[in-house]
From Swiss-Prot:
This is Probable G-protein coupled receptor 139. Orphan receptor. Seems to act through a G(q/11)-mediated pathway. The chain crosses the membrane at residues 22-42, 58-78, 95-115, 141-161, 174-194, 221-241, 261-281. It comes from Rattus norvegicus (Rat). GO terms for molecular function: G protein-coupled receptor activity; identical protein binding; neuropeptide receptor activity. It comes from the Eukaryota. The gene is Gpr139. Belongs to the G-protein coupled receptor 1 family. Glycans are attached at N11. Its main location: membrane. Residues 43-57, 116-140, 195-220, 282-345 are cytoplasmic. It is found in: Cell membrane. Keywords: Cell membrane, G-protein coupled receptor, Glycoprotein, Membrane, Receptor, Transducer, Transmembrane, Transmembrane helix. It is a multi-pass membrane protein. The keyword Coiled coil does not apply.
Amino acid sequence: MEHTHAHLAANSSACGLGFVPVVYYSFLLCLGLPANILTVIILSQLVARRQKSSYNYLLALAAADILVLFFIVFVDFLLEDFILTMQMPPIPDKIIEVLEFSSIHTSIWITVPLTVDRYIAVCHPLKYHTVSYPARTRKVILSVYITCFLTSIPYYWWPNIWTEDYISTSMHHVLVWIHCFTVYLVPCSIFFILNSIIVYKLRRKSNFRLRGYSTGKTTAILFTITSIFATLWAPRIIMILYHLYGAPIQNPWLVHIMLDVANMLALLNTAINFFLYCFISKRFRTMAAATLKALFKCQKQPVQFYTNHNFSITSSPWISPANSHCIKMLVYQYDKHGKPIKVSP
């Protein structure tokens, strides 16, 4: 993320918002880090109990958000801009910048396979367990993490376009456009297309009911996450492109205020998922309360019964468990490696 304070430290108007950014980012870190750690704990329990692919994706998302909060909010904004009030040496600073882009790309792109997972569950329910299962999900998550890191290496040469002596080059334009496409335009296009198909599919079924909280709740969480992401990240993308191609802004104080607000909104996305899960899912809310209660009382949580082989008819909302005997289909269970095993009903 761009520095908007450190390089103007000598100027009395270095930060137009005064102490608002340091207070905001401190609050965001103190709120978001424990919330995401608690989310990891709860989702780890749900993954062990239910062997659901969507829980694995949400778990990976929480882990990526923790990395974003550490590298961007703590190291970049708080440590470098407000505590040290100076930039790190060039090479370590650029390495940290690569890790920042890697973490933010992972946080965004891990939602894409989750969207595909929900699309298959809703639109192709009978194929869901042959396509999406824990072993494959873990491979997809690992691939996303590795790919996002490797594709973030070119951001070692990411320009600081907000300095007064910045000189635009063609390589900088390419990097900026790649950033805008990879973190916003392409993911939002995928979210919009697949979510539109899901909504269309749901509305076509007049007898649709959210039977079994799995698909209904997870799909609602997906819609909420993607909608909030598109809203909170839009100001940052607009600011970057406007500053790159728009008319020169004579008031740098106003520029830095606008960028500060845009960055604040974008990073808010990494700290609020826990509260969205609690609001939407009663199961998650109950487990969060039990975990916090056990934590404050220094007690072990009661052992939850679960089976290593998770039987499931379907994750589709179209099929009621009461009516599943009317449908000719296969029942799947998972082996110890998380791969589905076909068992005749």
